[in-house]
Amino acid sequence: MCIRDSPNPEVPGTEPPAPIKLGFDSLPTSMTDGCVVPNGYVAHVFAPWGTPLNDNAQPWDQNGNNSSNDLLNAMGMHHDGMHFFPIEGSSTEGLLAVNHEYIDENALHPNGPTLVAGKRPAEEVRKEINAHGVAIVHVRRANGRWTIVNNSRYNRRFTSATAMKLAGPVGGTDWVKTPFSPNGTQVRGTNNNCGNGYTPWGTYITAEENWAACFVNTGTRPAHQRRVGVSAGPAGRYRWETATGDATEVLGEFARFNVTETGASATQDWRNEVNGFGYLVEIDPYDPTSIATKRTSMGRFAHEGCAYSKPEAGKPLAFYSGDDSRFEYVYRFVSEAVWDPKDADRTDRLAVGAKYLDRGTLYVARFNADGTGEWLALTGATQGTGGRTLADEFG
């Protein structure tokens, strides 16, 4: 502690700086069940669950009578992370990327989820699958209110059934080969999208979080499935796999949620389907023809979000993400490529993403008892507490 006999003298002819004030009146503590904003501000609901994005969807029905096709062409359920991408720098028109993290089954269906002779109806399952994922929505503000631009070419949905690319070190390996993608370069869907991020080149990052329990293994779960929390049965979280064998099923769309090893190889059952989930997914909101890409270099876990450090020309980029499960870790991905400011203005945004996000080093944070910490590189040569390297463990 430092004690002075008298305060610091003021500099002659100057006035002390004015205290910093909020630009709005603070709100008192309240038990009000509603959205309350300060005086001079207005809040209104727009783009809620079920809002059509185009004329292929019927208006939202509060009794749960909308179809799976309606949900494929409308806002998904339970909005979470989101980001606004301006169109030509505008603050009144742009593309809103919105995560749809999970579902409320009782609200989706007229009588809640049904189970008939141990099976879920295919239409109900498709509806739930389409209520998950991400929406890219063209929005515009006029007269103080935001609205969706219906039928905009930018409006699109990514669901738990949308085909996506697997990029980085996992893509194309034996770990992700399935009957749907025998070469391991694609996977269907993104699930339980919680937090989010964005990139310096204008793409959206959606984080897959609590995806593991949507899958079930009724046999012997390998260590990597136990580690992430794949269900041991008798069913997955939503019982989507029970619709297997429905006459309308296409390419194992329901069977894939049962990752029990039953075939002679990975392309004869769905053991690897779950390995296509647990990543940060990059989406180009400005290109409605682009394919969402899972950036496997950035780690596989229950991602909560993604944030990057200040880009500096000639230096690598760093992206930070946390595993939002109990007793888990904080991670940092450092790109192999160094930042070129010209890449911020390129229109081939997913190619830029491949440049920075497909090759690099993933680190995990270690926090010491004395308050210090360090970043531990997760490479093949990294040793664990038992002295074995990651290469020894995983080959």
Question: Model-found features: residue ranges?
Answer:
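Conserved small/polar residues in nucleotide/adenosyl-binding loops
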Residues: 1-6
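Conserved small-residue
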Residues: 8-395
